[in-house]
Amino acid sequence: MTEVTELMRPEGEALNTKEVLLNLGPQHPSTHGVLRLVLQLDGEYVERVDPHIGYLHRGTEKLAESFTYTQIFPLTDRLDYLCPPSNNLAFALAVEKLLGIEAPIRAQYIRVMMAELARISGHLLITGALPMDLGAMTALLYAMREREMIMDLLEMITGARMHTSYCRVGGVREDLPDGFLPKIREFCEIFPNRIRDYERLIENNRVFLSRTQGVGVISATDAIDLGLSGPNLRASGVDWDIRRDEPYEIYDRLDFDVITREEGDCYSRWLCRVDEMRESIRLIEQCMEQMPEGPFQVDIPTIAFPVDKERVHCSMEALIQHFDLSAYGFDVPAGEVYSVIEAPKGELGFYIISDGSPKPFRMKVRAPSFVNLQALFGVTNARYLADMIAVLGSLDPVMAEVDK
């Protein structure tokens, strides 16, 4: 049999091979959005990958120039639509820097608690979606069960499950409703055991491990050179987290560990997100313990809407305040600012130029998914076509944030 096989194998120029271009997407379930990858293949090896983006471009940055600062919050919801509270927070902090104000302490605790709920929500999806992409369906069903609990909590606070628009310049839209804290405590008690369930599903799954361990390796040096951030950076051994290293809001009052891994492969990126969910639970519990009573937005009539909505119906001053802020907005001092937070996907930044009017002269969004997607150039060379799904899934891009 060996002799026959050797005789059948072509030699030299008799082996006729050629490079093939293959389109992956833009309609493909494993791209998790409208992303088109043009792959240059040599057999089953990926020699080159060219991401083609823009299928979900809505002109968010240009639209913002025609909106007042308050009206921009719904636009930020639609960047990383899996984690709207984080987007709201990053934008609010940028505008507050221009105004030279800070939200009340209670509002800061509420914002951080919402941001960590959003982090868990975003990580839950990729925790289940990456195994599903590689054939392990059960993890996604479990993850969606817990994510539904978070959606219920967000709906209880904001009235919306996805596009929450909860932050406001100078605070949050409204205070926590009655009965919310017991609900979130119940979630914090249940969820750590559920995380362990996900790990048990995966840690002995030989197919998932073989498809992710040692696949799509990004070294620490390459991760820094590519500008990666968030779990994709920390999974390569770079110990950097804006919440700790450049703290904003009340993160400097909270105790948490920055999760890092050394391997830099797809499995490490998955594990980083799983472990970060545990830390988010710790942060939420500390927020509930430390949160003081007090106002949930600044008491500046030219910036904040009336706290007591009933006054709008019986007070001329409150009605004028509400109408003026709704129709005209508020003037922001001329200047420019850049504000960045640690969003679930990485460093989310807003660069705003103000000309002194109620609308930004220019707004630029530093979207972490856009930057992280560049890592495809560095990790797919000489890899199998089948590995592309694992690599892309482990980077966890959201195309609405990429295309803006």
Swiss-Prot record:
Its EC number is 7.1.1.-. Gene3D superfamilies: Cytochrome-c3 Hydrogenase, chain B. It is a peripheral membrane protein. It comes from the Bacteria. Its main location: membrane. Keywords: Cell inner membrane, Cell membrane, Membrane, NAD, Plasmid, Quinone, Translocase, Transport, Ubiquinone. The keyword Cell inner membrane applies. It is an enzyme of class 7 (translocase). One of its GO terms (cellular component) is plasma membrane. GO terms for molecular function: NAD binding; NADH:ubiquinone reductase (non-electrogenic) activity; quinone binding. It is found in: Cell inner membrane. The keyword RNA-binding does not apply. It catalyses: a quinone + NADH + 5 H(+)(in) = a quinol + NAD(+) + 4 H(+)(out). NDH-1 shuttles electrons from NADH, via FMN and iron-sulfur (Fe-S) centers, to quinones in the respiratory chain. The immediate electron acceptor for the enzyme in this species is believed to be ubiquinone. Couples the redox reaction to proton translocation (for every two electrons transferred, four hydrogen ions are translocated across the cytoplasmic membrane), and thus conserves the redox energy in a proton gradient. Belongs to the complex I 49 kDa subunit family. PANTHER family: NADH DEHYDROGENASE [UBIQUINONE] IRON-SULFUR PROTEIN 2, MITOCHONDRIAL, NADH-UBIQUINONE OXIDOREDUCTASE 49 KDA SUBUNIT. NDH-1 is composed of 14 different subunits. Subunits NuoB, C, D, E, F, and G constitute the peripheral sector of the complex. NCBIfam families: NuoD, PRK06075.1. This is NADH-quinone oxidoreductase subunit D 2. The lineage of its organism: Bacteria, Pseudomonadati, Pseudomonadota, Alphaproteobacteria, Hyphomicrobiales.
